C-alpha cells in the first residue's frame, strides 16, 4: 500500500493553508493529528513554493522548522522537510530527518557531499522551472515528459557519482504549476508515471493534493478540491505510487482502507 506523507506548512502564504500553522504549537498539534489520521511521514515546509510567494530567508526557515522537528522527533515520528536551500538541507542533515524533499531536484553540487554522508532519503522532484518557485508558464505535455525523463537521468547520475546510494532516491514528477499552467501536462504525467518507475527502478512520489490542474478541470477553488484530489490520489495508488503526499490525510487513509478491503 502507498505510504502517506501528511503536509504541514509552517508558512504565511502556502497556496492552500498559508498562515494556519505558522505558530509552532499549532504546527505540532496539526502534525500529531495527521499521524493519528494515518500519515506515515510528516512533510514540513517552512517556505512556500506557490507562484505568488514571498521569499523566506534561510535563518527564518530554520527558525520555523527547528522546534517542530524537535517535538516530532521526541515522539518518534518520521519527518520529511520540504526545502530547496542547501543551508537548510545541511541543517536537516544535522537534525537527522528521515527525508529531504527538494522541489528543485538538488541542483546545487555543494550539498552533495553532505547528502552522501547522511542516511536520509531524498525526494528528487522535477519541475519545468528547474530553479525557483512554480511559475505560470504554458507547456506541451509530451515535451515536458521527455524533458523530465532526461532530467531524472542526469540528476540521478550526478547524485550517485557524488556518493549518494541510488536506493535512497525517490522521484517526484511534479504536478500543477510545477509542470506549467496547462492541466493536460499534469494529466499526462499522472497517467504515465509508472514509466518513471520502470525506467529508473526507483520509488515514485505523487503529490496532487489541491493542485491547480484539478481546479482548472473541475472549476473548484483550493478549499473545494477534496473530491478531485482523492480521485487523482486513488488513481495514483491503483497505478502503483509508492508515496502519496497530501493535505487531507484522513480522507486518503480511509479510502485506501476501503480499496484494500475490496481487493
UniProtKB/Swiss-Prot annotation:
UniProt domain Pterin-binding: residue ranges: 2-257
Chain sites annotated for binding (7,8-dihydropterin-6-yl)methyl diphosphate: 82, 101, 172, 211, 245-247
Pathway: Cofactor biosynthesis; tetrahydrofolate biosynthesis; 7,8-dihydrofolate from 2-amino-4-hydroxy-6-hydroxymethyl-7,8-dihydropteridine diphosphate and 4-aminobenzoate: step 1/2
Residue numbers binding 6-hydroxymethyl-7,8-dihydropterin: 101, 172, 211
Residue numbers binding Mg(2+): 9
Binding site for 4-aminobenzoate: 49, 177, 212
Note: The sul3 gene is located on various large self-transmissible resistance plasmids and on transposons.
Job description of the protein: Catalyzes the condensation of para-aminobenzoate (pABA) with 6-hydroxymethyl-7,8-dihydropterin diphosphate (DHPt-PP) to form 7,8-dihydropteroate (H2Pte), the immediate precursor of folate derivatives. Confers resistance to sulfonamide antibiotics, including sulfamethoxazole (SMX), sulfadiazine and sulfisoxazole.
Protein name, entry field: Dihydropteroate synthase type-3
Gene from which the chain derives: sul3
Amino acid at each position: 500500500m502507498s505510504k502517506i506523507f501528511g503536509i504541514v506548512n509552517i508558512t504565511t502564504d502556502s497556496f492552500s493553508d498559508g498562515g494556519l500553522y505558522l505558530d509552532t504549537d499549532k504546527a505540532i498539534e496539526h502534525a500529531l493529528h495527521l499521524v493519528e489520521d494515518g500519515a506515515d511521514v510528516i512533510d514540513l515546509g517552512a517556505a512556500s513554493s506557490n507562484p505568488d510567494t514571498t521569499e523566506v530567508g534561510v535563518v527564518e526557515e530554520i527558525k520555523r522548522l527547528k522546534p517542530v522537528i524537535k517535538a516530532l522527533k521526541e515522539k518518534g515520528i518520521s519527518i520529511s522537510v520540504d526545502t530547496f536551500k542547501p543551508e537548510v538541507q545541511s541543517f536537516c542533515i544535522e537534525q537527522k530527518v528521515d527525508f529531504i524533499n527538494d522541489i528543485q531536484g538538488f541542483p546545487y553540487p555543494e550539498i552533495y557531499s553532505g547528502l552522501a554522508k547522511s542516511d536520509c532519503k531524498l525526494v528528487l522532484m522535477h519541475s519545468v522551472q528547474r530553479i525557483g518557485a512554480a511559475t505560470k508558464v504554458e507547456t506541451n505535455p509530451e515535451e515536458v515528459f521527455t524533458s523530465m525523463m532526461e532530467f531524472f537521468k542526469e540528476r540521478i547520475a550526478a547524485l550517485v557519482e557524488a556518493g549518494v546510494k541510488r536506493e535512497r532516491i525517490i522521484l517526484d514528477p511534479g504536478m500543477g504549476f510545477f509542470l506549467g499552467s496547462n492541466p493536460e501536462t499534469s494529466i499526462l504525467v499522472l497517467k504515465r508515471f509508472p514509466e518513471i518507475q520502470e525506467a529508473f527502478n526507483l520509488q515514485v512520489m505523487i503529490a496532487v493534493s489541491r493542485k491547480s490542474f484539478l481546479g482548472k478541470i473541475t472549476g473548484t477553488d483550493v478549499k473545494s478540491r477534496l473530491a478531485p484530489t482523492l480521485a487523482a490520489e486513488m488513481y495514483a495508488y491503483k497505478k502503483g505510487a509508492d508515496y502519496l503526499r497530501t493535505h487531507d490525510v484522513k480522507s486518503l487513509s480511509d479510502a485506501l482502507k476501503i480499496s484494500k478491503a475490496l481487493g
